[in-house]
Regions:
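Membrane-proximal soluble regions of multi-pass membrane proteins
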Residues: 17-72
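Juxtamembrane boundary at the C-terminal end of a transmembrane helix
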Residues: 244-254
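Generic alpha-helical transmembrane segments of integral inner-membrane proteins
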Residues: 4, 8, 12, 16, ...
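Select subsegments of transmembrane alpha-helices in polytopic membrane proteins
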Residues: 69-76, 122-124
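C-terminal ends of transmembrane helices
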Residues: 18-23, 59-67, 107-119, 164-176, ...
Protein backbone atom coordinates (compact mmCIF):
# COMPACT_ATOMS: atom_id res chain seq x y z
CA UNK A 1 0.00 0.00 0.00
CA UNK A 2 2.78 2.40 0.96
CA UNK A 3 4.56 1.67 -2.31
CA UNK A 4 1.46 2.67 -4.29
CA UNK A 5 1.17 5.92 -2.34
CA UNK A 6 4.87 6.68 -2.88
CA UNK A 7 4.47 5.80 -6.57
CA UNK A 8 1.63 8.32 -6.91
CA UNK A 9 3.45 11.01 -4.91
CA UNK A 10 6.59 10.49 -6.97
CA UNK A 11 4.61 10.92 -10.18
CA UNK A 12 2.93 14.11 -8.93
CA UNK A 13 6.16 15.68 -7.74
CA UNK A 14 7.87 14.58 -10.95
CA UNK A 15 5.24 16.50 -12.89
CA UNK A 16 5.93 19.57 -10.73
CA UNK A 17 9.67 19.09 -11.32
CA UNK A 18 9.02 19.28 -15.06
CA UNK A 19 7.22 22.60 -14.55
CA UNK A 20 10.24 23.94 -12.64
CA UNK A 21 12.70 22.67 -15.25
CA UNK A 22 10.80 24.46 -18.01
CA UNK A 23 9.90 27.69 -16.21
CA UNK A 24 12.75 28.56 -13.82
CA UNK A 25 15.31 29.29 -16.58
CA UNK A 26 12.70 31.57 -18.18
CA UNK A 27 12.02 33.36 -14.86
CA UNK A 28 8.38 32.26 -14.99
CA UNK A 29 6.25 31.41 -11.96
CA UNK A 30 6.17 27.72 -11.12
CA UNK A 31 2.92 28.14 -9.17
CA UNK A 32 0.70 30.35 -11.30
CA UNK A 33 -0.63 29.32 -14.68
CA UNK A 34 -1.64 25.96 -16.09
CA UNK A 35 0.67 23.74 -18.08
CA UNK A 36 0.69 24.28 -21.83
CA UNK A 37 2.20 22.76 -24.95
CA UNK A 38 5.54 24.49 -25.70
CA UNK A 39 4.80 24.20 -29.44
CA UNK A 40 1.20 25.38 -29.92
CA UNK A 41 0.88 27.06 -26.48
CA UNK A 42 -2.54 25.45 -25.94
CA UNK A 43 -3.33 24.78 -22.28
CA UNK A 44 -3.20 21.11 -21.39
CA UNK A 45 -6.41 19.56 -20.06
CA UNK A 46 -6.25 17.64 -16.78
CA UNK A 47 -6.81 14.28 -18.48
CA UNK A 48 -3.78 14.92 -20.69
CA UNK A 49 -1.66 15.95 -17.72
CA UNK A 50 -1.65 12.74 -15.69
CA UNK A 51 2.02 12.10 -14.83
CA UNK A 52 3.68 9.38 -16.95
CA UNK A 53 0.35 7.83 -18.00
CA UNK A 54 -0.73 10.67 -20.29
CA UNK A 55 2.59 10.58 -22.14
CA UNK A 56 2.06 6.90 -22.91
CA UNK A 57 -1.62 7.27 -23.86
CA UNK A 58 -0.85 10.21 -26.16
CA UNK A 59 2.10 8.27 -27.62
CA UNK A 60 4.39 11.18 -26.83
CA UNK A 61 2.49 13.74 -28.91
CA UNK A 62 0.40 16.83 -28.14
CA UNK A 63 -3.32 16.14 -28.60
CA UNK A 64 -3.80 19.52 -30.30
CA UNK A 65 -0.83 20.12 -32.63
CA UNK A 66 0.47 16.52 -32.82
CA UNK A 67 4.04 17.71 -32.24
CA UNK A 68 6.28 15.38 -30.26
CA UNK A 69 6.50 15.90 -26.52
CA UNK A 70 10.06 16.00 -25.22
CA UNK A 71 10.98 12.59 -23.79
CA UNK A 72 12.49 14.47 -20.86
CA UNK A 73 9.01 14.85 -19.34
CA UNK A 74 8.55 11.10 -19.05
CA UNK A 75 12.13 10.52 -17.87
CA UNK A 76 11.80 13.11 -15.09
CA UNK A 77 8.53 11.65 -13.85
CA UNK A 78 9.91 8.10 -13.90
CA UNK A 79 13.05 9.21 -12.06
CA UNK A 80 10.92 10.90 -9.43
CA UNK A 81 8.79 7.77 -9.00
CA UNK A 82 11.90 5.61 -8.71
CA UNK A 83 13.46 8.00 -6.17
CA UNK A 84 10.39 8.03 -3.94
CA UNK A 85 9.99 4.25 -3.98
CA UNK A 86 13.72 3.56 -3.51
CA UNK A 87 14.11 6.00 -0.60
CA UNK A 88 11.12 4.48 1.19
CA UNK A 89 12.44 0.97 0.53
CA UNK A 90 15.85 1.69 2.08
CA UNK A 91 14.95 4.19 4.81
CA UNK A 92 11.31 3.45 5.65
CA UNK A 93 8.82 6.02 6.94
CA UNK A 94 11.28 8.27 8.75
CA UNK A 95 12.26 11.93 8.91
CA UNK A 96 15.43 10.93 7.08
CA UNK A 97 13.30 9.61 4.21
CA UNK A 98 11.25 12.80 4.12
CA UNK A 99 14.39 14.93 3.86
CA UNK A 100 15.89 12.71 1.17
CA UNK A 101 12.64 12.93 -0.82
CA UNK A 102 12.91 16.72 -0.75
CA UNK A 103 16.55 16.52 -1.80
CA UNK A 104 15.74 14.12 -4.65
CA UNK A 105 13.26 16.56 -6.22
CA UNK A 106 15.75 19.42 -5.98
CA UNK A 107 18.43 17.21 -7.52
CA UNK A 108 16.23 16.15 -10.43
CA UNK A 109 15.32 19.77 -11.22
CA UNK A 110 18.94 20.96 -10.97
CA UNK A 111 20.21 18.02 -13.03
CA UNK A 112 18.04 18.75 -16.06
CA UNK A 113 18.23 22.56 -15.89
CA UNK A 114 22.03 22.50 -15.80
CA UNK A 115 22.18 19.80 -18.47
CA UNK A 116 20.06 21.89 -20.82
CA UNK A 117 20.83 25.50 -19.92
CA UNK A 118 24.25 25.34 -18.19
CA UNK A 119 22.89 27.19 -15.15
CA UNK A 120 21.96 26.27 -11.59
CA UNK A 121 19.41 28.82 -10.31
CA UNK A 122 19.86 30.40 -6.89
CA UNK A 123 16.17 29.65 -6.30
CA UNK A 124 17.25 26.01 -5.94
CA UNK A 125 20.67 26.13 -4.26
CA UNK A 126 19.87 28.68 -1.54
CA UNK A 127 16.83 26.78 -0.18
CA UNK A 128 18.91 23.58 -0.26
CA UNK A 129 21.62 25.24 1.85
CA UNK A 130 19.08 26.53 4.36
CA UNK A 131 17.26 23.20 4.70
CA UNK A 132 20.55 21.33 4.95
CA UNK A 133 21.82 23.51 7.78
CA UNK A 134 18.55 23.75 9.74
CA UNK A 135 18.03 19.98 9.75
CA UNK A 136 21.51 19.49 11.25
CA UNK A 137 20.19 20.76 14.61
CA UNK A 138 17.91 17.70 14.95
CA UNK A 139 19.79 15.14 17.09
CA UNK A 140 17.38 12.35 16.14
CA UNK A 141 18.33 12.17 12.47
CA UNK A 142 20.35 9.34 10.93
CA UNK A 143 23.88 10.40 11.93
CA UNK A 144 25.44 7.94 9.48
CA UNK A 145 24.18 10.16 6.67
CA UNK A 146 23.54 13.56 8.24
CA UNK A 147 26.11 15.51 10.32
CA UNK A 148 25.56 17.72 13.35
CA UNK A 149 25.38 21.48 12.89
CA UNK A 150 29.13 22.02 13.37
CA UNK A 151 30.15 19.57 10.65
CA UNK A 152 27.28 20.84 8.51
CA UNK A 153 28.55 24.42 8.71
CA UNK A 154 32.13 23.34 8.02
CA UNK A 155 30.88 21.24 5.10
CA UNK A 156 28.98 24.13 3.55
CA UNK A 157 31.94 26.49 3.75
CA UNK A 158 34.42 23.83 2.63
CA UNK A 159 32.24 22.74 -0.29
CA UNK A 160 31.88 26.29 -1.57
CA UNK A 161 35.52 27.28 -1.11
CA UNK A 162 37.01 24.22 -2.78
CA UNK A 163 34.97 24.73 -5.97
CA UNK A 164 35.50 28.49 -5.82
CA UNK A 165 39.27 27.93 -5.63
CA UNK A 166 39.14 25.62 -8.66
CA UNK A 167 37.21 28.29 -10.58
CA UNK A 168 39.66 31.00 -9.48
CA UNK A 169 42.87 29.16 -10.39
CA UNK A 170 41.44 27.82 -13.66
CA UNK A 171 40.61 31.37 -14.72
CA UNK A 172 44.09 32.55 -13.72
CA UNK A 173 45.79 29.80 -15.73
CA UNK A 174 43.47 29.59 -18.76
CA UNK A 175 42.20 33.19 -18.70
CA UNK A 176 38.59 32.04 -19.15
CA UNK A 177 35.71 30.69 -17.12
CA UNK A 178 35.64 26.99 -16.27
CA UNK A 179 33.05 25.91 -13.74
CA UNK A 180 30.40 28.37 -12.63
CA UNK A 181 29.52 29.65 -9.17
CA UNK A 182 26.32 27.61 -9.42
CA UNK A 183 28.52 24.51 -9.05
CA UNK A 184 30.15 26.05 -5.96
CA UNK A 185 26.75 26.76 -4.41
CA UNK A 186 25.57 23.23 -5.21
CA UNK A 187 28.65 21.78 -3.54
CA UNK A 188 28.06 24.07 -0.56
CA UNK A 189 24.51 22.73 -0.30
CA UNK A 190 25.85 19.17 -0.34
CA UNK A 191 28.31 20.13 2.39
CA UNK A 192 25.49 21.53 4.53
CA UNK A 193 23.47 18.35 4.01
CA UNK A 194 26.17 15.71 4.46
CA UNK A 195 29.13 17.41 6.13
CA UNK A 196 32.68 18.10 5.07
CA UNK A 197 33.62 14.41 4.81
CA UNK A 198 31.29 14.06 1.82
CA UNK A 199 33.04 16.72 -0.25
CA UNK A 200 36.27 14.90 -1.29
CA UNK A 201 34.32 11.78 -2.27
CA UNK A 202 31.70 13.74 -4.23
CA UNK A 203 34.38 15.71 -6.09
CA UNK A 204 36.36 12.56 -6.89
CA UNK A 205 33.36 10.55 -8.10
CA UNK A 206 31.82 13.43 -10.05
CA UNK A 207 35.14 13.96 -11.85
CA UNK A 208 35.46 10.25 -12.67
CA UNK A 209 31.87 10.05 -13.96
CA UNK A 210 32.39 13.22 -16.01
CA UNK A 211 35.50 11.74 -17.62
CA UNK A 212 33.67 8.50 -18.41
CA UNK A 213 31.00 10.44 -20.31
CA UNK A 214 33.21 13.11 -21.88
CA UNK A 215 36.27 11.14 -23.07
CA UNK A 216 34.39 9.07 -25.72
CA UNK A 217 32.95 12.26 -27.25
CA UNK A 218 36.45 13.75 -27.38
CA UNK A 219 37.83 10.63 -29.05
CA UNK A 220 35.17 10.59 -31.78
CA UNK A 221 35.53 14.38 -32.07
CA UNK A 222 31.83 15.07 -31.45
CA UNK A 223 32.96 17.42 -28.68
CA UNK A 224 35.90 19.84 -28.60
CA UNK A 225 38.21 19.85 -25.59
CA UNK A 226 37.31 23.51 -25.04
CA UNK A 227 33.55 22.80 -25.08
CA UNK A 228 31.52 23.86 -22.06
CA UNK A 229 30.43 20.97 -19.83
CA UNK A 230 27.58 21.19 -17.29
CA UNK A 231 29.22 19.83 -14.14
CA UNK A 232 26.15 20.00 -11.89
CA UNK A 233 24.72 16.65 -13.07
CA UNK A 234 28.02 14.92 -12.29
CA UNK A 235 28.14 16.50 -8.82
CA UNK A 236 24.65 15.15 -8.20
CA UNK A 237 25.64 11.65 -9.35
CA UNK A 238 28.67 11.82 -7.04
CA UNK A 239 26.42 12.83 -4.13
CA UNK A 240 23.98 9.99 -4.83
CA UNK A 241 26.89 7.53 -4.78
CA UNK A 242 28.02 9.01 -1.46
CA UNK A 243 24.58 8.58 0.12
CA UNK A 244 24.28 5.06 -1.29
CA UNK A 245 27.61 3.95 0.17
CA UNK A 246 27.96 6.31 3.16
CA UNK A 247 28.26 3.43 5.65
CA UNK A 248 31.05 1.75 3.70
CA UNK A 249 32.87 5.05 3.12
CA UNK A 250 32.84 6.06 6.80
CA UNK A 251 33.84 2.57 7.95
CA UNK A 252 36.76 2.66 5.52
CA UNK A 253 37.91 6.15 6.57
CA UNK A 254 37.22 6.02 10.28
Amino acid sequence: MYYLILFALGAIWGSFANVCIYRLPKNQSVIKGRSFCPHCKKKIQWFDNIPALSFVLLMGKCRNCKKSINLQYLIVELLSIFSFVAIYHFFGLTVTSFLLLILSIFFIIIFFIDLKHFIIPNELTFPLMIIGFIKSFDPNLNTTIFPNYIYSLIGGVFGYLIIWSIIYFYKKVRNKEGMGLGDAKLMAAIGFWFGWTSIPFVILMSSIVALIFVIPSLINKSRKISSEIPFGPYIIIGCILYVSFSNEIKNFLF
